[in-house]
Amino acid sequence: CHELVPEGKIGNMLLGGLMYPLSCKPEDVFETLQENRSWQFFGDVQARGAYPGYMQRYFRDNGITLTITDADREALKTTVDFISFSYYMTGCVTAGEALNQQARGNI
C-alpha cells in the first residue's frame, strides 16, 4: 500500500475486551494477565512486527511449533499504522472456575 499510495494508512480492527481481576488476590491478578495476553497477542504481532516473548513461551510450554521463515519474519516487520476497535467491553477474571463463569461478561 505505501508504495502505491505513500500517504495511505493500513490498520487492523480488534475487539477491545480488557479484563480486570475480580479481587486483589495474586492468583486473580495472574489469571487476568494471562487472559488479556490471549487476545492482545494478535495486535502485538501486527503493531510490533514480531511474536512477543510471552507467546513464544506459551507455544514452547504447550508443544506448539511454528515454521517461520526469514521471509515470514521480514513480512511481519511491515506493521500497521493504526489500531481500531470494533467493540469495547470489560469483564472480571478470577482463578475460581465456578465464579469465573459469572464474572466474565457477555462473551
Regions found by a protein language model. Give the residues of each.
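Active-site region of glycoside hydrolase catalytic domains
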Residues: C1-I107
